[in-house]
Amino acid sequence: MQSRIILLFILVSASISTVSAQYTESINNNRPGGSQGAFAVGKNVLQFEGGFGLGKEKHRLLFTETDAILVDYSVRYGLIKEELEISVIGTFQSNSFIDTRITNANKQRLSNFKSNTVGAKYLVYDPYRKRQMNGPNLQSWKANNKTQWADLIPAISIYAGANFEFADNPFTPQAESSINPKLVLSTQNNFIGGFVLITNIIADRITEKEPTYGYIITITHAPTEWFSLFVENQGFKSDFYADQLFRGGASVLITPDWQVDASVLLNIKDTPSRLFGRIGMAYRFDMHEKDEYLENKGKAGRETRRSEKGKVKKLKKQKKDNQKRRKDGFQTDPLEDDGGDDGGLN
């Protein structure tokens, strides 16, 4: 127990990969933590995130020792607009356990999905975009490099998904197959100095007899552009299972579209005690065309887009008319005239 507390202290003393607003020049992903950031991956960005983990569990009351292998995966895609993404997120786990009360006991095995969820996330509020549009304070270096009251206002998103759970699954409360909802409220604060605070409020399996309610708090620090550290606390409670989990780790940006990571998970209870190590990576296919200003919404946004569309149509019509006149009357298209010397003909 003492060694586990020491390890926990180390994790908390350190400071998920760097997460920033909307589409970014480098990959924006949720690994290696368990929380969801408030921002989407960006329109037309397809992103794959996955990892592999090994762990050990010991249950004091059941007298069992378990060796576990898990694979977690996530596929995320931004579509229609910058604020929206759809995703498939899940974890598959295989356990091999023995009864420690029996000498030379045979190992028993069980495997299934701990979670498998299809859902969508929408960014409801982004306080950072307007600041980017306004630009920095040109009269005060200090104002641009200190935490301000405005930094306490987070970006907010809502996630809604459906859990697909199979029959006779030892990792879920239901004995039969079911499809049930999951809701997540995510907030994200980006602070000066490369610090990010993410919080998730979670309501899971809320239509079942044993719903789960919980939270995740993640703190990220990026001391450089290619390296980041994180610590995380997750708590959840239901009649089926309750726990407090602590995670910590680091991630390295190999290229703007590729990141690798390593992390550790532990808890402080003994029914069961849990200790896991994980490695993983994330890669994105960046088909993003242009960044949108999210404030261009509603009537103002429609008028702006209508005006831009009208300008494009006007230019096309003008060019078409000029081409027709040039063909019929050998007139020079003013759009194509380079303004050069006429060779002295006039």
Question: What do the PLM-derived regions correspond to, one by one?
Answer:
Residues 1-27:
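Bacterial Sec-dependent N-terminal signal peptides
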Residues 22-206, 210-263, 267-346:
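Transmembrane beta-barrel domains of Gram-negative outer membranes and organellar outer membranes
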